[in-house]
Amino acid sequence: MKWFWSDPHFDHEAIASKMGRKTEGIDSWNACAIEAINKHVDRHDQFFILGDFTWKRPGYWRQQINCKHITLIRGNHDDGITKLQNVFGAGNIYDLRVVKVRGVHTVLCHYPMAFWDRSHKGSYHLYGHIHYSAPREKLLDLLGDRKSMDVSPEASLDYFGYYRPFNEDDIYTILSARKGHDFPKMLPNGGPDA
């Protein structure tokens, strides 16, 4: 099973309070996030963290996660590539990655995109960074019934009522119900990919 979550921000007090995470302080958030991951993500699953893994102690927080197969999609708080390579392995860190979610081409990036590879053909895009901020999500919704979604803890709280990563079945259920971009009909001559 593939699992996706962005922005855990371990040890990042300012983000935990700014984002209104429903925990009492950073230690409580850290424990809540680790419990949510380990309760749902099996040791042999694939776990994709879409950026902003931790403020400090990446090795410590990686050891707290039981899953053996973790891929980090770097975010704006994921500095120190050498340290991260030592924690995750050089072949497990990307700025952008493409995977299949129930057979659907899916672009993973920390940042939301208006257009992504094959977006006009129904591909998915998973991102973080904006922490499911309503004004930002509404701005993205102006682009139409897009097949992209925020997979942050704030988004999981809204979808499930509690914090947990999204699995590939969640992603497929949510995004397959959306119509998706119809950009070729909106652009002159069908656009560049027609």
Name these PLM-found stretches.
Residues 1-61, 147, 151-155, 174, ...:
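N-terminal active-site segment of His-dependent metallophosphoesterases
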Residues 6-10, 51-54, 76-78, 111-112, ...:
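Active-site metal-binding loops of divalent metal-dependent hydrolases
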Residues 16, 50-67, 74, 79-93, ...:
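Metal-dependent catalytic neighborhoods of phosphoester/phosphodiester hydrolases
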Residues 21-24, 74, 164-166:
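Short coil/turn linker and secondary-structure boundary residues
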Residues 39, 61-65, 98-100:
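Short, conserved, surface-exposed binding loops centered on an aromatic residue
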Residues 45, 68, 123:
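Conserved acidic residues
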Residues 71, 86-191:
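Conserved beta-sheet core of the metallophosphoesterase superfamily
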